[in-house]
Amino acid sequence: MTPKPNTTSPTNNLPLLSKDSPDIESLLILNPKVQDKANAVPSAVTKKNKHNWKRNEEKGCGSTCGESKLKNDFRDIKHTTLSERGALKEAMRCLKCADAPCQKSCPTQLDVKSFITSISNKNYYGAARQILSDNPLGLTCGMICPTSDLCVGSCNLQASEEGAINIGGLQQYACDVFKQMNVRQIVSKEVRENRNASHKEQVALIGCGPASISCASFLARLGYTDITIYEKRAYIGGLSSAEIPQFRLPYDVVDFEIQLARDIGVQIETNRPLGKDGLTLAKLKEQGAAAVFIGIGNPEPKIDPLFEGLTIENGFYTSKNYLPAVAAASKPGMCGCKRTPLPTMRGRVVVLGAGDTAMDCATSALRCGASRVTIAFRKGFTGIRAVPEEMEAAKEEKCEFLPFSAPRKINVKDGRIVSIEFNKTEQDDNGKWYEDEEQIVILKCDYVISAFGSTLKEDAVLSALQPCQLNKWGGIEVDSTTQQTSEKWVFAGGDVAGVAETTVESVNDGKIAAWNMHRYIQSLHGNQVSETPELPQFFTPIDEVDISVDMCGVKFENPFGLASAPPTTSGPMCRRAFEQGWGFILTKTYGLDKDLVTNVSPRIVRGSTSGPLYGPNQGSFMNIELISEKSCEYWLQCIRELKRDHPTKIVIASIMCVYNKADWIELATKSEEAGADILELNLSCPHGMGEKGMGLACGQSPEIVKEICRWVRACVKIPFFPKMTPNITDVREIARAARDGGASGVTATNTVSSLMHMKADGNAWPAIGSTKRTTYGGMSGSAIRPIAMKAVSSIANELDGFPIMATGGIESAETGLGFLMAGASVLQVCSAVQNQDFTVVDDYCTGLKALLYLSGAESLKNWDGQSPPIEKHQKGKPILLQGQKKMPFFGKYRDEREKLEAIKLSESNLLDTENYHFASRPDTQVSRVPTVEDVIGKALPRIGPYVTLDNQEQKVAIIDDDMCINCGKCYMTCNDSGYQAITFDPVTHQPHVTEDDCTGCTLCYSVCPIPECIEMVPRTGPWKAPKRGVKPSVEPGTPKVVKVDQRGRVILDTTGGMQ
């Protein structure tokens, strides 16, 4: 037998201090332990146990039994829906490819790479702006696009094990956050100032569906001021409102996108059908319309002659009367009704068709009470036209599928449908399909919904479309490259034009039509317009925010520039950077020709700080690259050319010399004469150059730094900034020496000296030559951001008002704003470009504008930058039942929760708008937008020495059971790295914080995978002294801080006074 361990001290019979007490041992029962034996549990037991933990559907019964559990449940069903956490994780996974195939596969040509880059940088406005610039219905399309057949189908990550990016979900998330910002669209200043008489021409659009909304939006962005959409229904949105179910596309989304169009002058008139009340093409032209767009869809259903005479009273629907009836009863805000009953669907429903509409009919039927839904179609599963996303949704909701079935007869008894008969379909060896009347299937049913497509056949409408020519299928004859009809002034798009089969293709029809309508209208005024579309982008007041900044009398268009690094290896690279929008560049550090270098290779490697993460978004790089290999005259000439061609951009010459007065004077003078706006003195290169008596060899000595600064100050008039090294005990000493030597400011900081990869055979990476030697290199990237942030803030606090150029881990507008608030004036970027390309600057500029604008909005004070408050959710979707103790989201608890949810849904009013965010005008009001100068140093008053912190305002952790996914990470870290203050229920796996034991260390909060599932809240009750283990001879208090001087030094009261 294993001897029982001692629990008391052999000397004084007291409990062992180095052993957990019995209550802690009980708490640790589920804490991981190293296993020294294999596990063995009978399968009969594991088969039973697994049901206690399942989060997915049980396999087995393939259909619903009795009334559908989905009745009245119009909550979001999309697997693509994301929370902020999910969106950031997915966006970080994106490769942001060159010549991205996802964009090529998008009908509207969305710049997918760019908007996902913005999402990964938490610039949701920038992402939404990119999306809405190319697709005014970006939120709708993010929700319902058949992405597997479009962008996602072309994603290069399809070639990897982890699979393609959830592009639709990311698009939905970014646009939804912008929707919550409630910022109006405006016409850009450039367009407003260039309007002429042609922009007053009257434009009419018929039908308020996706194609018309898109067309009208682009025409308004082009500057047209008299745009009217005529809609036959009492509500707007077309098919998006009437036929796409609420659980896929909520009405508040449609309302939001139409409000954006109204913001820029688009007028909408409802109850104006084509063919009635004088609304015809001829009348519109008589009334002064210069151009007309037809976007009426295909309003009539295709009905098999088999169903002639059948009505709703018999139990027969078409998709064209069923889905609008469901929408009217389930889409809050659509028609202004307070309560409208859903179509009754008790019993068995058969849906005919295999397209997306058929799947919508089937899943809607379950929500109307159907006990069983069968989708019957003529061909096999391989011939289903519905996109995989739609079919999988129907399958998951237990719809049945009946392939190879063509309806032959509907049986009616006492005026109600009782069954439907099918012939089996076959395909011969030549690929021709036929019906085999010898193989008959009779399916009992109570309702039949026909979803065999739609057409345009109403005589009044066809008459109103004259003189437009019709094609042989009865649709409008349209030029598919311009959307122009046989009449030059009439254009058409969407279903009625015959090419578009999806919402996004309809949107694109409207987009193409808008440009060609613009060309046509301009031609009437004798103005020539390019055949290649030049459509204005989406624009809001955010885009008018000024992010320029003055530093040392030099005006920067924006605070983002390229550091002296690989992105500025050559003059042409610097020029391209300016063309993409960077506010300034630093040349690659150059010296006199006598100090020219030759680099080794390999020399720039991915860091080890990101673990096994390959591809973009590396947390760090390590380089052993030296300064520029190009001559001094090369760089002087490049500076001359860049300043000549880009006079408003700022060129900063990065220079380096040995510790020699004549050399510094010569190089600084030549650089100033070439036209450099500012000099940066590279006194901090951490590898290679120090061994030559340059770089770090100069920058670690305050005396040398001060003297070099004096030499340069004496010979140039332009500002200069010595570049600080982080490889020193106190960077403030070097900064102070630079200031005392006459420097205009400093750059903080250079890379951190490091050694990255060590392989199993003892070789490091990078390994040079046949001997595989290596050296210490400079680490850059987000991994050094905390070091750089500390350097910037400490210098700013030490030298009040001293200008600082920050560098080190700046990779977004948000991180850049952090450096500005820590005291920096402008921001240098390197590793973020190495991870991506020069175009990231557009994301940084829009992101900074948005951050400044939103900070001035009182109504958004509870936002964290561009991140809205986190609502309680599971899988990115709101929780219907909140505060249900002891009821996690798995096993039997999941079943119990679903039953309670069904009860609540059955009692709810589906048309209640309370839980939806509808667009409101006036939009978010901003009192004053801060400038960049306003935010510089804003955080400094709250950054200081440790002894200024109050150790009696304690906080403790609290865990939200509604958001918890029961992983136990908080429990484990508290046990093995903290204070054993969290219990973990063995049955529900719900963690709970014991407040008396919690010290507020925040480890649990830090490792929790769900943001804000754990919150740090003030401790209740009076302050309690820490558990000392053994009672101290004296219980210390907190020293009183008498004074904190400007250099951060703390003066304490040492007379014994304690707080």
From Swiss-Prot:
Domain 4Fe-4S ferredoxin-type stretches: 84-118, 955-987, 989-1019
Residues that, per the record, bind FMN: S564, K588, T589, K723, G781, T807, G808, G809, C830, S831
Endpoints of the signal sequence: none
GO process annotations (BP): beta-alanine biosynthetic process; thymidine catabolic process; thymine catabolic process; uracil catabolic process
Tree of life domain: Eukaryota
Binding of substrate, residues: N623, N682, L683, S684, N750, T751
Residues annotated to bind [4Fe-4S] cluster 4: C998, C1001, C1004, C1008
Binding, [4Fe-4S] cluster 1: C94, C97, C102, C155
Keywords per UniProt: 4Fe-4S, FAD, Flavoprotein, FMN, Iron, Iron-sulfur, Metal-binding, NADP, Nucleotide-binding, Oxidoreductase, Repeat
Residues at the active site: C685
Cofactor(s) in the UniProt record: [4Fe-4S] cluster; FAD; FMN
Positions with a binding annotation for NADP(+): 354-357, 378-379, 385, 451-453, 495-501
EC number: 1.3.1.2
Binding-site positions, [4Fe-4S] cluster 3: C964, C967, C970, C974
Residues annotated for [4Fe-4S] cluster 2 binding in this entry: C106, C145, C151, Q171
Assigned GO CC terms: cytoplasm; cytosol
Top EC class of this enzyme: oxidoreductase
Reaction(s) this enzyme catalyzes, per UniProt: 5,6-dihydrouracil + NADP(+) = uracil + NADPH + H(+)
Pathway: Amino-acid biosynthesis; beta-alanine biosynthesis
Molecular function as annotated in GO: 4 iron, 4 sulfur cluster binding; dihydropyrimidine dehydrogenase (NADP+) activity; metal ion binding; NADP binding; uracil binding
InterPro entries linked: 4Fe4S_Fe-S-bd, 4Fe4S_Fe_S_CS, Aldolase_TIM, Dihydroorotate_DH_cat, DPD_II, FAD/NAD-bd_sf, FAD/NAD-binding_dom, Helical_ferredxn
Pfam families: DHO_dh, Fer4_20, Fer4_21, Pyr_redox_2
Stated role: Involved in pyrimidine base degradation. Catalyzes the reduction of uracil and thymine. Involved in the degradation of the chemotherapeutic drug 5-fluorouracil.
Note: Worms lacking dpyd-1 exhibit increased sensitivity (decreased survival) to the chemotherapeutic drug 5-fluorouracil.
Family: Belongs to the dihydropyrimidine dehydrogenase family.
Protein name: Dihydropyrimidine dehydrogenase [NADP(+)]
Annotated source species: Caenorhabditis elegans
Organism ancestry: Eukaryota, Metazoa, Ecdysozoa, Nematoda, Chromadorea
